[in-house]
Amino acid sequence: MLRHLVVGAVAVLAASAGVGALAPSAGAATTVGISVDAGTSVGTVPSSGVGLNTGVGDENMGTAKVSSLMKAARVRQLRFPGGSGADGYHWKTHTMSDGGWVVPNTDFDHFMATAKKVGAQPILTANYGSGTPQEAADWVKYANVDKGYGVKYWEIGNEVYGNGHYANGKGWETDTHADKSPKEYAKNLVAYAKAMKAVDPKVKIGAVLTTPGGWPDKEKAPGDSADWNNTVLSIAAKSIDFVIVHWYPGGTTTADLLNTPSRIAGVTSELRSLISTYAGSHAASVEIAVTETDATFSPALTSQAAALFAPDTYMTWFEQGATHVDWWNLHNGTDQAPTTVNGQTDYQDGGILSAGTCAGGKCQPPRDTPFPTYWGIRSLTALAQPGDTIVKSSSRNPSVAVHAVRSSNGGLNVMLINKSPQNAAQVSLSYAGFTPAAGAVTTVSYAKGATSLTTAKRGTAGAQTLPPYSITTLQLKPASGTASADKPSPAPTPTAATPVVSASGTTGTRAQAENSAGTPVSQPTPNGTSGGLASTGASSAVTYSALGGLLVIAVGGMLALRGRRRRASHGK
């Protein structure tokens, strides 16, 4: 069965109605002041931070071409076995509990071979929904004792809060437990951790949390004394090593989407506050993992706005202390017809590589063709390597985002993202703690419509012109005769949670935008028989009703349309 992404009606309507702009009208050249303090650290680029989701239905996952593309993008982590399917996946038999779609060359050993070729660390999602602690412990034994793979990170379930506990039993996540409450999940989570660490004490266990600001965060179902996050952490915080959130901020326009990274600081601050409350002396070692993110719930999924969103999102999460960020997805597929977003075809597909899907009489590029989102992620290779120091930087205009990194060779790399679809941006840069060499600088850029990164000598360290809708990374060397900056001093770590304010647009999980019972997300849609989520948001009232082929979810007065569970035929 195909579990594939379907973008909802509100997002599609937003695309057809046009998108917002972050800069003045066409023709105006915006001047933006950028400040970089190379002497103040805001974090370290994590060793396995740049991650990507894979799935058991993706027959091209381990091909030489696909592995080469992932390696070139320096993907450092691969997640397996794939989203909501993980709660139905049985690793020993390479089968789904509901008889769902898998392909022969995507079992665990094949996945590990792919991870090795790419040079990526695996992060595995143990089956909570239809599995047991013993099944998970057996997986640890096979992976780390029998095979010597050394798999370190293990999630316990996918979006377990989507099991129907908050929606009268109508959820998207497989969960065969009679009790679907957060209390029961937490008790079982402790049991999973105990069983798995008995086999290999070095494994790290992750707890599924709701994302602050997104449904069902802060909800309490009948009989609950607290919401999901407080309940789970109050019971299990001392048994876990990392917490898991999924980040799908969306937006009704591309401008909304590109503004959402500004909300990440509030999300991480709230998570840190929760961890500190419940984990005690263990709190400082509990990591934050964002194991799914992309531009779902916005007009752009494959076009340039999504490409700009990708590196901005990765780097902002790293600046806030996240140690893993995994994009959804390697291949995805869709039954949605392509749209036009800012003059560019958007294939409405969450994959970074084309799945070769045809819909609405139009076909994607040949399978494995990189979408702009791939190049957005690959742009990070020009900015940072694992272990590099992220330093403080700021922009005086939200139309240009900035991220800066002190490289291991003593240089300074500065990524500039022009979010205006129409206007070039004149940028004036100032530096503290680093004196850049004079003359033209090496830049690595990705512009709208490009099919590769471009390296050139352009502008100076103090002045650059950024094309519309572009990513430009300056690779600066210290001035001759000057020492590179001293080791950057650490920035203060926030201790109090700041309010999480939802941006206009939508918020939710990827699974809420999928056909809830098809074959895996990576498999192309054969017959276009699925619905999609139009809009959802944090609220207390959730009701369900049937409307034709759709499940209508009323969330506090907002409508969400979700494809009803159905079985589909398969085709290539």
Regions picked out by a protein language model, each given a short descriptive name:
Residues 15-25:
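C-terminal segment of classical bacterial N-terminal signal peptides
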Residues 29-238:
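N-terminal catalytic cores of secreted or lumenal carbohydrate-active enzymes
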Residues 181-316, 320:
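Noncatalytic carbohydrate-binding groove/subsite architecture in carbohydrate-active enzymes
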Residues 295-378, 388-401:
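Aromatic/acidic polysaccharide-binding cleft in carbohydrate-active enzymes
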Residues 396-435:
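Carbohydrate-binding surface patches
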Residues 454-486:
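C-terminal beta-strand-rich structural cap/linker in extracellular carbohydrate-active enzymes
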Residues 503, 509-548:
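Extracellular Ser/Thr-rich, low-complexity/disordered mucin-like segments
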Residues 546-572:
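C-terminal membrane-anchoring or membrane-association module
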